[in-house]
């Protein structure tokens, strides 16, 4: 199904918990800064995803909080795995990934994105308020070993991390990961000074790239290949390309459909109607109707 702007819905991002075992100073918790309603069950998530198939969803991204904190995560993946879903991926901080990678693969998970903003153990502990970077690296190694690939490393470009980019690039090249450089969205005024314009970084990488590809169904995002390393950029801020080619809707952990990454004022309740026995397809239609580009030309 297309929205009013001709954008086909293809992807569904599921935030399955607000909880996290780290406390990164920049975290916006997928746009939900407070714990609100009841956590959805694995069965409810499965039913909502199943309804989304009618509207064109073929890719699922699972996130949080930290999704590996949900002990029923393999069950959730099993519920949503079917022949119509072409790709199920998960974004994690990687702390628990070594322990659960094989179970997730067995349940039907295809691949993972692991957040990693620095390779410096001291800086990592400072950014995450106590995280152990060695646990993350072991988790990445295990994920690659069991076949949760292509693995992507999510690098958040901030004033305090950009100096780590060359080392991160070398690390990703060495382990065979794709590097995703993400623009920092400051959700609070006191964090604005951490924002870094990633356009010059992208221009520099584009200049030195061996090959450049365009991902048509991912906001026309460019993929650069430089010395064997694949690099992508995610630039949501003031980016008309990002918005005009967006194919994703989102589900909050407490059961609200979220039409836009950058808005939290037009959520559509779907969990409570489901619990009341309603046909939830009309709520998907409402969500898709609410979609409009946040950044317009």
UniProtKB/Swiss-Prot annotation:
Query: Any note on cofactor binding?
Result: Binds 2 [4Fe-4S] clusters. Binds 1 [4Fe-4S] cluster coordinated with 3 cysteines and an exchangeable S-adenosyl-L-methionine and 1 [4Fe-4S] cluster coordinated with 3 cysteines and the GTP-derived substrate.
Q: What class of enzyme is it?
A: lyase
Give me the residues that bind [4Fe-4S] cluster 1, please: 20, 24, 27
Plastid: present as a keyword of the record? no
- Write out the catalysed reaction: GTP + AH2 + S-adenosyl-L-methionine = (8S)-3',8-cyclo-7,8-dihydroguanosine 5'-triphosphate + 5'-deoxyadenosine + L-methionine + A + H(+)
Instruction: Please report a single Pfam family linked to this protein.
Output: Fer4_12
One biological process term from GO is: Mo-molybdopterin cofactor biosynthetic process
Where, in this chain's numbering, is S-adenosyl-L-methionine bound? Answer: 26, 65, 115
Regions that span the bilayer? none
Q: Which GO terms describe its molecular function?
A: 4 iron, 4 sulfur cluster binding; cyclic pyranopterin monophosphate synthase activity; GTP 3',8'-cyclase activity; GTP binding; metal ion binding; S-adenosyl-L-methionine binding
Q: Which PANTHER family match?
A: MOLYBDENUM COFACTOR BIOSYNTHESIS PROTEIN 1, MOLYBDOPTERIN COFACTOR SYNTHESIS PROTEIN A
What does the record give as the function of this protein?
Catalyzes the cyclization of GTP to (8S)-3',8-cyclo-7,8-dihydroguanosine 5'-triphosphate.
Descriptive protein name: Probable GTP 3',8-cyclase
């Amino acid at each position: 199904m297309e929205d009013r702007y001709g954008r086909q819905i293809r992807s569904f991002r599921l935030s399955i918990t607000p909880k996290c075992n780290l406390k990164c100073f920049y975290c916006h918790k997928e746009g939900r800064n407070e714990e609100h309603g009841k956590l959805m069950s694995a069965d409810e998530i499965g039913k909502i995803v199943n309804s989304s198939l009618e509207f064109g969803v073929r890719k699922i991204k699972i996130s949080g909080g930290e999704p590996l904190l949900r002990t029923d995560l393999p069950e959730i993946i099993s519920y949503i795995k079917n022949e119509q879903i072409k790709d199920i991926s998960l974004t994690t901080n990687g702390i628990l990934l070594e322990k659960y990678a094989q179970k997730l693969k067995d349940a039907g998970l295809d691949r993972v994105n692991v957040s990693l903003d620095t390779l410096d153990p001291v800086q990592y502990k400072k950014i995450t308020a106590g995280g152990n970077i060695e646990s993350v690296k072991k988790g990445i190694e295990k994920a690659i070993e069991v076949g949760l690939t292509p693995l992507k490393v999510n690098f958040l470009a901030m004033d305090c991390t950009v100096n780590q980019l060359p080392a991160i690039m070398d690390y990703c090249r060495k382990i065979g990961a794709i590097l995703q450089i993400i623009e920092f969205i400051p959700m609070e005024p006191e964090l604005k000074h951490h924002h870094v314009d990633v356009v010059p970084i992208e221009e520099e990488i584009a200049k030195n790239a061996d090959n450049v590809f365009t991902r048509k169904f991912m906001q026309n995002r460019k993929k650069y290949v430089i010395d064997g390393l694949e690099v992508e950029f995610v630039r949501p801020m003031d980016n008309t390309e990002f918005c005009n080619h967006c194919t994703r809707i989102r589900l909050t952990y407490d059961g609200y459909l979220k039409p836009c990454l950058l808005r939290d004022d037009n959520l559509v309740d779907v969990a409570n109607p489901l619990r009341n026995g309603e046909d939830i397809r009309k709520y998907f239609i409402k969500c898709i109707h609410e979609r409009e580009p946040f950044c317009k030309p």
